[in-house]
Amino acid sequence: MEKAATVLGLTIVRIPVVATETVDWDAALKRAVAAKVQALVTAPMTANYDITDKLAAYATKYRLPFMHDVPQLARDALAVYGPDFEDIFRRAGHYVARILKGEKPAMMPIEEPREFRMIVNQKVAKALGLTLPYTIILRANEVIE
């Protein structure tokens, strides 16, 4: 992400989070607004899934594009790009079948996600006064109107 930001002339403002339960989100997000951020992007970590609604509400309040990596939580984000969890769960079933047939879990390779989903939200774009490029819309797996 750092390289891409540099190439595009962007600056990344980080809001470090160790444990979501102990973070004062209002203070953290106010720091982001004070830093004049122009978008919110969450890091791909499960700790962020519980606060997606809060981040989306904050992004809406301050008219910031919000992007994250959980396709199942796409309704309030401008864009989502992340692993296809349905595919991951199907793959998990294959692992279970292999274990039930006697294969040792310690000897099985770890798999990374094979499929990713991109969802763009035209409704959010319109509310923010943005027009999504046609090339992005064409690449999206789903477009929310």
Tell what function each PLM region has.
Residues M1-E145:
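Short hydrophobic alpha-helices and adjacent helix-cap/hinge residues
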